[in-house]
Structure formats: structure tokens, C-alpha cells
């Protein structure tokens, strides 16, 4: 009860940041399970593991996208790391609005609850994470699940806006007099620009989905062509938020990467002022390129040329950041530590995603590649491999500040090598599949795509093995934590017994010790069952693939 009150009512920015991290990791685990079922379904042609239920396949696609974007990566970067470190880096004891900070966390919990409710209600919400009106309108999806999704977007958006207002207020109101903006850390600049982007773009998304809710329930026709509405209007409203969302996710990761380089090299990143201006330019230009997601809706030639040119122009400040990081690696005496390898991996993956983005900025190529797996590979290399790897680097870098342990070097290198090979096995073949017009959001395909589509499953199983390994590592950490806690509790109980001559404290300590050790044993049995499930799927898939070939 004391622990629940401590978490529910806490206004400490560090406690709220840790709660954001833990809940976001849980959400990411759920989203990963959805993606595992997606890859299992795509590893076979015809009737796969979902038994031909195409609606449920689209529900998995929708849930995976919304959870990973709104409930995993955004809360980790803005809710977790920014809440924990922003007040410390500006020299303030807490956020400027601590109770609003607590309220934004519980709004995030409510939004995730609505999201899961939409997945479990009736036939689910197979509309795609973009929520286009042609799919989510009442004629095609009369389920209450779609309304839950719209409410979840509202809850998560309000949570992000409150958190962003808090971050901006903390950074500006706590700034000392005669304190130059240019000597802020790059992480603070990333958090500040991300918060400003959220405050500007999220109300536009909220207005768009509110009109969608009215069309579904109040007989309006904002997006109904028969009633005089415009379908493309929602795409403009959504992508005005949707493309800056990429920079909302990646800018705090830029700050984390720069912070790790500064700490390990004992000096600032090369040309910090240029890094600041490049982030400013990325944020400004990112507001004016939303329609490059809409090249196939019938735009005129001038609009296509404008949005394509601005998209290419964003590559300039991005290259400035990449070359400054590379220069900092090559020409500074860095302390070689484990998180540096995460930074290497982040730079390579983000560079690969950026290069494929340059291909898609060409209007003709984008029209050819639209709604294929080439686009899926592009944004997964930027987000799933870029942002998540940067978050891993920041997490391991600051791990010693949260947990007073040191992880073994061999297992750390095992972790990053498995992550490297598994993630590239999953996403790199999607480029070739997309160039041969493998369509998105469709669970069946010709047999000519079977080999590479099944090959990605092996990478997914490798990542599943890595997730189970992380669960084992977490249980080992908790195991030692349990041991130390209950040994101290047992010693304290014995001292009370010898002082008061009563067996009650000793019996309570033994009872708690037995219960928690049984809990640990059950955890390990669950992990063993997960291992068995992964290897069963692996051999089953290999047998069926051999049968098909």
C-alpha cells in the first residue's frame, strides 16, 4: 500500500521518469508480441497462423504501430529520460509543475488502457495506424473499438502536451540570469525542440480525430464525400502531425547520443553550435514537408516539386550532425566503453534509413514504392533501429546511476551483436521485397516472395531470443535484490526476537522469504516455457518452409 501511494502520488521527477520508463517498456513488449505474430503470419503463404483472419491481421498492424509510436518510444524519450534528466541538467530540483507532471503520467496510462480496450473490443480496429476515414468510417467499421482508438489518441495527446508544457516551463523558467542559450547541453536542446513541436502539432491531430469521431457518431460529413466532405483533408491534418512525429521521436535521441559522446570523450561534441542550429533547422523544415506522404492523392506538379525539394533539404542539417559525430569519434581520445558500440550502431542504422529516405523524396520513385515494404524498411531503420538503439545506448549509459551493479562485458557484447544481426535480418530484406512490389497490410502474397519473407522470421526469432535473455537478466538482478532485501529483513527480525522474545517477526520474515523465492522460481519456469515456444516455432517454420519449397 505504501509503495502504491509512493508511485501514484509522487511528484518527484525522478520517480515519474522511472515509472514512464517501466510502463513504456511493458508497452513495447506488448507491441513486440504483436509484431512477432505479424512476422509469423507473413512467413507462410495462404492460411497462416491466423487461419486466414485478415481482419485480425490488420488489427495486429494497427495495434503494433500505435503502441510502438505513442506508447513506447515517445514515453521513453520524453517521459522517461527528459523527466529524469532535464531538471538536473538545468540545475533545478524538480519540474516547474510537478503535479501536472504526475497527471500527465496517469493520462498516459489511461490512453494506453483505451488502446488495449480497442484491441479487445468486438472485432478490433483493423484500420491501420494512420486512421484514414475510408477505413474507419461507420460504414466499414461500426465497432466501438475505433472510438476507443480515437479516445486513446486524445488521452495520449493530452499527456504529451502537458509533459511538453512542463519541460518548456522548466527549461525557460529555471534559466539563470546572464545564462547563454548556447551552453545548454544538446540533450536539453533536443528536449526543448521536441516539446515545442508537440505543442504545435498535437492540437492539429486532436482536431482531425475529433472530426472523425463526429463523423462516426453525430451524423456529420467532414470526411464524407457524399455530404460535401473531403477525404484528403484528414490526410493533411494527420500528416501535419505525422511527419514532425519522426523528429519528435529522434531529436531527444540525438541529444542522448551527443551526451554519451561528450561524457566518454571528456569534451564537447565537435562544433556544438552547428549541432544546435542543425536541430533547429530540422525542426523548422520538418513542419513543411508533411505532404510528401501524399504524392499519390492527385497533387499538382508544383506542390510535388516543393515538398520533394524541402524533403531533400532536410538531409543537409542531418548530414551536419552525422559528420560532427564521426569527427568527434575520429579526432578525440575517447574512453572505450560499451555504450560507444550502441552509438556506432545508431549512426550506421540512421544513415541507412536516411539514404532510403532520399530515394523516397523523389516523386517518381515514391509513387512506385508507395504502400510497399520498401517504405516499411525505411521508417523502421530510422525508428526501430535508429531511435530504439539510441535509447538502448542511453539506458546502458545511465544504468549505473539507477542500479548499483556492473554487467559482464561478454553478455553486453552478446546483447549488441544479437541485436545487430537480428534486426538487420528482419528489416534489410524488406528493401528488396518492396522493390519487387510486395504490398503492405496484406497477409497473403505470391510464392515468389516466400523465401525472403520467411527469412525475416529467423531474425525475428533471434530478437525474441534476445528479449527472453533480457528477461533472464532482469530476473537475475531482481533475484540478488530480493536476496539482499530479505537477508536484511531476516537479520532485523532476529534482532527484534532477541530483544522482545517473540516469534512473530521471524515467522513473517520466513513467510515472505518463501513466497518471494517461489515467485522467482515461477519466473524462471515461465522463461523456460518461452524458450521452448521459440524453438518450437523455429522448427515448425523450418519444416513447413522445406515442405513448401
Swiss-Prot record:
The protein's Enzyme Commission number: 7.1.1.9
Residues annotated to bind Mg(2+): 370-371
UniProt keyword annotations, A-Z: Calcium, Copper, Electron transport, Heme, Iron, Magnesium, Membrane, Metal-binding, Mitochondrion, Mitochondrion inner membrane, Respiratory chain, Translocase, Transmembrane, Transmembrane helix, Transport
Chain sites annotated for binding Fe(II)-heme a: 64, 380
UniProt subcellular location: Mitochondrion inner membrane
GO biological-process terms attached to the record: electron transport coupled proton transport; mitochondrial electron transport, cytochrome c to oxygen
Location (main, coarse): mitochondrion
Needed cofactors: heme; Cu cation
Entry keyword annotation includes Cell membrane: no
Family: Belongs to the heme-copper respiratory oxidase family.
Alphabetized InterPro entries for the sequence: Cyt_c_oxase-like_su1_dom (IPR023616), Cyt_c_oxase-like_su1_sf (IPR036927), Cyt_C_Oxase_1 (IPR000883), Cyt_c_Oxase_su1_BS (IPR023615)
Organism of origin: Trypanosoma brucei brucei
Cofactor note: Binds 2 heme A groups non-covalently per subunit.
UniProt pathway annotation: Energy metabolism; oxidative phosphorylation
Numbered residues of crosslink 1'-histidyl-3'-tyrosine (His-Tyr): 243-247
Protein name as catalogued: Cytochrome c oxidase subunit 1
Binding-site positions, Ca(2+): 41, 46
Top-level taxonomic group: Eukaryota
Job description of the protein: Component of the cytochrome c oxidase, the last enzyme in the mitochondrial electron transport chain which drives oxidative phosphorylation. The respiratory chain contains 3 multisubunit complexes succinate dehydrogenase (complex II, CII), ubiquinol-cytochrome c oxidoreductase (cytochrome b-c1 complex, complex III, CIII) and cytochrome c oxidase (complex IV, CIV), that cooperate to transfer electrons derived from NADH and succinate to molecular oxygen, creating an electrochemical gradient over the inner membrane that drives transmembrane transport and the ATP synthase.
MF-aspect GO terms: cytochrome-c oxidase activity; heme binding; metal ion binding
Primary gene name: COXI
Reaction(s) catalysed by this chain's protein: 4 Fe(II)-[cytochrome c] + O2 + 8 H(+)(in) = 4 Fe(III)-[cytochrome c] + 2 H2O + 4 H(+)(out)
Entry binding sites for O2: 247
Topology of this chain in the membrane: Multi-pass membrane protein
UniProt GO cellular component terms: mitochondrial inner membrane
Regions that span the bilayer: 18-38, 59-79, 100-120, 148-168, 181-201, 237-257, 279-299, 310-330, 340-360, 379-399, 410-430, 460-480, 495-515, 527-547
Amino acid at each position: 500500500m505504501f509503495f502504491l501511494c509512493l508511485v501514484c502520488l509522487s511528484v518527484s521527477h525522478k520517480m515519474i521518469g522511472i515509472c514512464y520508463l517501466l510502463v513504456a517498456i511493458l508497452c513495447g513488449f506488448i507491441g513486440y508480441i504483436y509484431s512477432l505474430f505479424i512476422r509469423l503470419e507473413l512467413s507462410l503463404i495462404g492460411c497462416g497462423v491466423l487461419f486466414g483472419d485478415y481482419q485480425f491481421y490488420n488489427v495486429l498492424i494497427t495495434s503494433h504501430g500505435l503502441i510502438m509510436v505513442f506508447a513506447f518510444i515517445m514515453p521513453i524519450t520524453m517521459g522517461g529520460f527528459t523527466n529524469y534528466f532535464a531538471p538536473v541538467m538545468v540545475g533545478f530540483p524538480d519540474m516547474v509543475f510537478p503535479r501536472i507532471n504526475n497527471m500527465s503520467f496517469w493520462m498516459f496510462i489511461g490512453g494506453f488502457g483505451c488502446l488495449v480496450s480497442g484491441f479487445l473490443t468486438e472485432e478490433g480496429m483493423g484500420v491501420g495506424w494512420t486512421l484514414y476515414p475510408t477505413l474507419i468510417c461507420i460504414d466499414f467499421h461500426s465497432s466501438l473499438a475505433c472510438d476507443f482508438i480515437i479516445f486513446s489518441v486524445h488521452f495520449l495527446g493530452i499527456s504529451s502536451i502537458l509533459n511538453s508544457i512542463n519541460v518548456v516551463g522548466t527549461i525557460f523558467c529555471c534559466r539563470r540570469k546572464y545564462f547563454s542559450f548556447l551552453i545548454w547541453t544538446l540533450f536539453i536542446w533536443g528536449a526543448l525542440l521536441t516539446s515545442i513541436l508537440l505543442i504545435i502539432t498535437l492540437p492539429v491531430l486532436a482536431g482531425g480525430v475529433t472530426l472523425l469521431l463526429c463523423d462516426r457518431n453525430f451524423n456529420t460529413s467532414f470526411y464524407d464525400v457524399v455530404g460535401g466532405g473531403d477525404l484528403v483533408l484528414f490526410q493533411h491534418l494527420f500528416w501535419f502531425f505525422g511527419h514532425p512525429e519522426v523528429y519528435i521521436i529522434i531529436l531527444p535521441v540525438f541529444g542522448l547520443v551527443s551526451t554519451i559522446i561528450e561524457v566518454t570523450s571528456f569534451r564537447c561534441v565537435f562544433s556544438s553550435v552547428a549541432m544546435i542550429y542543425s536541430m533547429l533547422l530540422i525542426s523548422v523544415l520538418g513542419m513543411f514537408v508533411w505532404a510528401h506522404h501524399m504524392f499519390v492523392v492527385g497533387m499538382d506538379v508544383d506542390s510535388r516539386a516543393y515538398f520533394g525539394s524541402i524533403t531533400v533539404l532536410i538531409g543537409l542539417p542531418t548530414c551536419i550532425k552525422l559528420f560532427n559525430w564521426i569527427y568527434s569519434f575520429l579526432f578525440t581520445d575517447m574512453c572505450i566503453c560499451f555504450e560507444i558500440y550502441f552509438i556506432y550502431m545508431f549512426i550506421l542504422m540512421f544513415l541507412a534509413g536516411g539514404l532510403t529516405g532520399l530515394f523516397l523524396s523523389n516523386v517518381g520513385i515514391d509513387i512506385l514504392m508507395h504502400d510497399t515494404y520498401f517504405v516499411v524498411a525505411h521508417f523502421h531503420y530510422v525508428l526501430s533501429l535508429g531511435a530504439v538503439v539510441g535509447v538502448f545506448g542511453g539506458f546502458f549509459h545511465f544504468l549505473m546511476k539507477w542500479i548499483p551493479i556492473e554487467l559482464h562485458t561478454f553478455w553486453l557484447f552478446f546483447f549488441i551483436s544479437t541485436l545487430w544481426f537480428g534486426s538487420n535480418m528482419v528489416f534489410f530484406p524488406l528493401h528488396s521485397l518492396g522493390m519487387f512490389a510486395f504490398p503492405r497490410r496484406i497477409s497473403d502474397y505470391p510464392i515468389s516472395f516466400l523465401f525472403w519473407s520467411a527469412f525475416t522470421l529467423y531474425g525475428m526469432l533471434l530478437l525474441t531470443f534476445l528479449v527472453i535473455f533480457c528477461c533472464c537478466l532482469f530476473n537475475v538482478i531482481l533475484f540478488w535484490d530480493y536476496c539482499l532485501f530479505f537477508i536484511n529483513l531476516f537479520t532485523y527480525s532476529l534482532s527484534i526476537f532477541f530483544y522482545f522474545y517473540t516469534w512473530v517477526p521471524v515467522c513473517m520474515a520466513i513467510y515472505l522469504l518463501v513466497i518471494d523465492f517461489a515467485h522467482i522460481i515461477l519466473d524462471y519456469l515461465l522463461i523456460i516455457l518461452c524458450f521452448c515456444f521459440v524453438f518450437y516455432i523455429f522448427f515448425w517454420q523450418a519444416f513447413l518452409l522445406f515442405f513448401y519449397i
